[in-house]
Amino acid sequence: MKNKILLLSFVVLLLTGCNTSYQPKKLNPEIKYDDVYLIMGQSNASGCSIQSYLETKSPEIYEKYTAGNEKVLISYDCDARIQNNFVPVKFGFGNNELCFGPEIGMSEVLSQKEDTSYIIKATWSGSCLRTEYVNEKGRKLKYYKRFVPFIKNQLMSLEKSGKHPRVRGMFWMQGESDSFLENKELYYDAEKCFLSYLKHDLNKWIYEYFNFVDAYIYDHGICWVNPEIINAAKQKYCDEDEHSYCIKTNGEDENAISLYLKCETNETDDLAHYDSLSMLLLGKTAGEYIVK
């Protein structure tokens, strides 16, 4: 009988593919925890928005993040640019030293908290969820295998310094590359597997809940193929999980924000990435959801 139960359990595991155990831990009232937030995804998570345009568009932000925000510290593996130490959030932590990502806007929200917050950013421009992170059958792929150990190492480094890290959630800005794949509706299954694995692998540092903030990919009908299918998959996942939130970026639906692409120069417009003010807004919106 026991062997039959074991066999049945194994069959169920094969059928479900990515079901894993995950149980948020209870907070110890005797411990002061240090809040950690994750940023993952592709180029609009890495950040291709040019910071110099904020010198005139948002002088206060430009001055603040040229110097650095001491209340929010970040470490990152961003397009193979690696910062293993936690340093103040500032400009230049994007796709290259001239660009920034959602960490700037998110820091504006996190710095309102009483204590220091930490961001771990693990992103790769052009990366595809279903072929490079986790596929719909539950197979872990190269960027999952790269970034999750990096995140765990950074959490352990906080522990070694006497901190008590608590992973509060993640902002996920990805999906553009997946729009080129066939069977786009499978994005939902892949995302579900990805988050199931991630929460399981980081379970040691998750207390009470894990907020997941997703964002629509830009729907302009030029760069991406049927982006509405990817966005529907994202919305479906968030609708099913009480601690998941989806940022609508089309500016039309209720509660949506309006983002604009990089058309800040006289050069060829960049139809794949957000302009500087839009990236600020995206990061702030993600921050407001992730601290709920």
Name what the model sees in each region.
Residues 16-17:
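C-terminal motif of bacterial Sec signal peptides marking the signal peptidase cleavage site
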